[in-house]
Amino acid sequence: MSWPRRLLLRYLFPALLLHGLGEGSALLHPDSRSHPRSLEKSAWRAFKESQCHHMLKHLHNGARITVQMPPTIEGHWVSTGCEVRSGPEFITRSYRFYHNNTFKAYQFYYGSNRCTNPTYTLIIRGKIRLRQASWIIRGGTEADYQLHNVQVICHTEAVAEKLGQQVNRTCPGFLADGGPWVQDVAYDLWREENGCECTKAVNFAMHELQLIRVEKQYLHHNLDHLVEELFLGDIHTDATQRMFYRPSSYQPPLQNAKNHDHACIACRIIYRSDEHHPPILPPKADLTIGLHGEWVSQRCEVRPEVLFLTRHFIFHDNNNTWEGHYYHYSDPVCKHPTFSIYARGRYSRGVLSSRVMGGTEFVFKVNHMKVTPMDAATASLLNVFNGNECGAEGSWQVGIQQDVTHTNGCVALGIKLPHTEYEIFKMEQDARGRYLLFNGQRPSDGSSPDRPEKRATSYQMPLVQCASSSPRAEDLAEDSGSSLYGRAPGRHTWSLLLAALACLVPLLHWNIRR
């Protein structure tokens, strides 16, 4: 027996017994008492699950989140790193909102995934007016905006020549003199007073200003360290649809330059930048993707179709299998659960992406799934369906898990098994040295990336590593029905042993590994 496990058996069990174990605890099961190996596995599993479970139960590192309604957006807001938009486009943002409701926004574009080589910058000026709280996205505020001027300035001669030609092709006659564009000169793409407009040449839209959310938190419970985050609406994954899309979730947040995380080096660099001095972020090597260990959400995540959730992935690199639970909620701070999904399957070896710099491509297969309704509304929805289209007809109860593999998924949730998805991942380290795992952004049209050509070119919010290795899948099988939410009605459970294995599903058109 390894020394970490001996330590667990020596010190963890007395602590657990002092904490208090109920009759339903696996550690007090007669079979566990009579089999030391089973006891040891339970202890090791409890130790690692407690870390991941604790992180899911205490999102934002346990910080208390305050949401401003209506939001106060006046100030200077900046990206926290190099962002990836569908295309792919590599971008950093610097937005200023003024007391008279006008704004000036910089969008800095780059030729690589580390945002070290600026190619061009968009300078956007306009006016914004906050409206009512969103009827669609709880916790968000709707807004209207009006553009006054959009300019572009190129940072190399090659980019200036290419972009000028692109504008000429997209909007023939737009450039009056027809001469080539040059570096470090600002050119109009939109001017309100004369009606000139050719923003589609760069797939530009500012509809992100139509959905706004501001969050405040005190890092590490330190009242002297306030961090403010501005969430703006998401960008359509199809660049040709950006002008017609109304946001239904959020982009990665901007931080207030006045109240930002002091560990954010990129924040300080972007804050000092302008169109003539675009931010150049510190170069970093791409981390090799090794899908192993356990990963959990850092915050309550928002998805299109009014979904709030947390995720927990488990990867077994010894046999290329994966597991997960997606925990769904009805509120934007993930306090009121609606249902959870447990899924498992296999994944391919990773191949470096030729399309998205820094990305690694995988193929995921899902062949097993369980569903747990966590409120009466979801249970009723599942019971509406006739026949064996989603588990046993009319048998759904709140807090009781059912296997839907034998019914080839669940029609009510839009799940069909078996299922294959074409994924992309990348890995980074944050300022605290923690590993972050990004997987592909879901298509904005609600479809699934079930063909290679539909593979994402941008990413979702990252997961953080909560355990560097994972127990074998067969060791966890007995606990696959455990719930993050706490006690199911009529059951006595012990919180440290609740499996936080979570994978995500939209209620109307659920997509595997969302």
From Swiss-Prot:
Induction: Target gene of the Wnt/Beta-catenin pathway, transcriptionally regulated by the CTNNB1/TF7L2 complex. It is a single-pass type I membrane protein. Abundantly expressed in heart, pancreas, prostate and ovary. Moderately expressed in lung, liver, kidney, spleen, thymus, colon and peripheral lymphocytes. Abundantly expressed in both the epidermal and dermal compartments of the hair follicle. Present in scalp skin Highly expressed in the hair follicle dermal papilla, the matrix, and the hair shaft (at protein level). Keywords: Cell membrane, Disease variant, Glycoprotein, Hypotrichosis, Membrane, Signal, Transmembrane, Transmembrane helix, Wnt signaling pathway. N-Glycosylated. Residues 27-492 are extracellular. The chain crosses the membrane at residues 493-512. Residues 513-514 are cytoplasmic. One of its GO terms (cellular component) is plasma membrane. Residues 438-460 are annotated as: Disordered. GO terms for molecular function: identical protein binding; Wnt-protein binding. Disulfide bonds: none annotated. Residues 1-26 form the signal peptide. Glycans are attached at residues 100, 168, 319. GO terms for biological process: astrocyte cell migration; hair follicle development; negative regulation of Wnt signaling pathway; regulation of odontogenesis of dentin-containing tooth; Wnt signaling pathway. It is found in: Cell membrane. InterPro entries: APCDD1, APCDD1_dom. Negative regulator of the Wnt signaling pathway. Inhibits Wnt signaling in a cell-autonomous manner and functions upstream of beta-catenin. May act via its interaction with Wnt and LRP proteins. May play a role in colorectal tumorigenesis. Belongs to the APCDD1 family. Homodimer. Interacts with LRP5 and WNT3A. It is linked to Hypotrichosis 1: A rare form of non-syndromic hereditary hypotrichosis without characteristic hair shaft anomalies. Affected individuals typically show normal hair at birth, but hair loss and thinning of the hair shaft start during early childhood and progress with age. HYPT1 inheritance is autosomal dominant. This is Protein APCDD1. It comes from Homo sapiens (Human). The lineage of its organism: Eukaryota, Metazoa, Chordata, Craniata, Vertebrata. The gene is APCDD1.
